[in-house]
């Protein structure tokens, strides 16, 4: 029957790229995004400071939109709290692109702690009916794996270890898959792993490493649960990524991805993920 067939389709996360102003949350979700990616910059003391990308950024985008990090978290909480006037039921996942390149390696743990404190207070509302979206902490440098432990330790110290159920991980530096696996071993992490691969939309990048990540995901002993590709703005690239078997597509144009998912070749194999889809679960065909 139809419902059973629907269940066999791969759930897809359409990830709105560089959503750094509160007003852009609605803009991207209304275009079809069920998830967003937000840049987080840090000050010299490893405090998350702004949701800001800066120059250069993707072709065709303004690089300079920003909010204070905690203000953005409050706006995000409104958008992901059922019953709130600003609630967007479709928005189920947020990737924080952590710009830790400005920090010394020995500040990574501290950055994780401060990030957790901010999220706990301003997004999770101290564990009292806060935002419901799943969160992916995306780290650009494998050496900054202690950020994960700092984040986890802080939530535990503040009495909310259960919130780690809503948190996943990504290393975004396009490193060799084996090296990424080793970083997770050092961090003591198994599960809740998203693997990104990609490059700015100004440049072309093949799917070789995406396919390696997907092979790891689909192998019996792989450490990856989900694979996403960025930044995908064209229909042809979207089709190639879906054909390869990705779980997520990061884009400046969510409506383009939505259009492709509605094409006859794709609508019986893929569907837009909903809140009921566990983003930490490897999809089995």
Swiss-Prot record:
It is found in: Secreted. Mg(2+) binds at residues 37, 39, 97. One of its GO terms (biological process) is lipid catabolic process. It comes from the Eukaryota. GO terms for cellular component: extracellular region. Pfam families: GDPD_2 (PF13653). This is Dermonecrotic toxin LiSicTox-alphaIA2aii. CDD domains: GDPD_like_SMaseD_PLD (cd08576). One of its GO terms (molecular function) is metal ion binding. It catalyses: an N-(acyl)-sphingosylphosphocholine = an N-(acyl)-sphingosyl-1,3-cyclic phosphate + choline; an N-(acyl)-sphingosylphosphoethanolamine = an N-(acyl)-sphingosyl-1,3-cyclic phosphate + ethanolamine; a 1-acyl-sn-glycero-3-phosphocholine = a 1-acyl-sn-glycero-2,3-cyclic phosphate + choline; a 1-acyl-sn-glycero-3-phosphoethanolamine = a 1-acyl-sn-glycero-2,3-cyclic phosphate + ethanolamine. Belongs to the arthropod phospholipase D family. Class II subfamily. Class IIa sub-subfamily. Disulfide bonds join 57-63, 59-202. Keywords: Cytolysis, Dermonecrotic toxin, Disulfide bond, Glycoprotein, Hemolysis, Lipid degradation, Lipid metabolism, Lyase, Magnesium, Metal-binding, Secreted, Toxin, Zymogen. Expressed by the venom gland. Dermonecrotic toxins cleave the phosphodiester linkage between the phosphate and headgroup of certain phospholipids (sphingolipid and lysolipid substrates), forming an alcohol (often choline) and a cyclic phosphate. This toxin acts on sphingomyelin (SM) with high activity. It may also act on ceramide phosphoethanolamine (CPE), lysophosphatidylcholine (LPC) and lysophosphatidylethanolamine (LPE), but not on lysophosphatidylserine (LPS), and lysophosphatidylglycerol (LPG). It acts by transphosphatidylation, releasing exclusively cyclic phosphate products as second products. Residues 1-5 form a propeptide. Binds 1 Mg(2+) ion per subunit. Gene3D superfamilies: Phosphatidylinositol (PI) phosphodiesterase. Glycans are attached at residue 262.
């Amino acid at each position: 029957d139809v419902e059973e067939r629907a269940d066999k389709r791969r759930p897809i996360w359409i990830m709105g790229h560089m959503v750094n102003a509160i007003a852009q949350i609605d803009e991207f979700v209304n275009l079809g995004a069920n998830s967003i990616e937000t840049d987080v910059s840090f000050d010299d003391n490893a405090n998350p400071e702004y949701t800001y990308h800066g120059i250069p950024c993707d072709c065709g985008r303004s690089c300079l939109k920003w909010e204070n990090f905690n203000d953005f978290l409050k706006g995000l909480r409104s958008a992901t709290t059922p019953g709130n006037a600003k609630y967007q039921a479709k928005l189920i996942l947020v990737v924080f692109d952590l710009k830790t390149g400005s920090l010394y390696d020995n500040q990574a743990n501290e950055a994780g702690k401060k990030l957790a404190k901010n999220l706990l207070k301003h997004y999770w509302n101290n564990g009292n009916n806060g935002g419901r979206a799943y969160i992916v902490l995306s780290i650009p440098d494998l050496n900054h794996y202690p950020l994960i432990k700092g984040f986890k330790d802080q939530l535990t110290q503040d009495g909310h270890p259960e919130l780690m159920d809503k948190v996943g991980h990504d290393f975004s530096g396009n490193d060799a898959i084996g090296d990424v696996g080793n970083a997770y071993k050092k961090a003591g992490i198994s599960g809740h792993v998203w693997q990104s691969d990609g490059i700015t939309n100004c440049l072309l990048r093949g799917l070789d490493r995406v396919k390696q990540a997907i092979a790891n995901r689909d192998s019996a002993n792989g450490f990856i649960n989900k694979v996403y590709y960025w930044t995908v703005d064209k229909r042809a690239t979207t089709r190639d990524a879906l054909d390869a078997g990705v779980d997520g597509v990061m884009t400046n144009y969510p409506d383009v991805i939505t259009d492709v998912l509605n094409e006859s070749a794709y609508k019986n194999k893929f569907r837009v993920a909903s809140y009921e889809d566990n983003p930490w679960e490897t999809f089995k065909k």
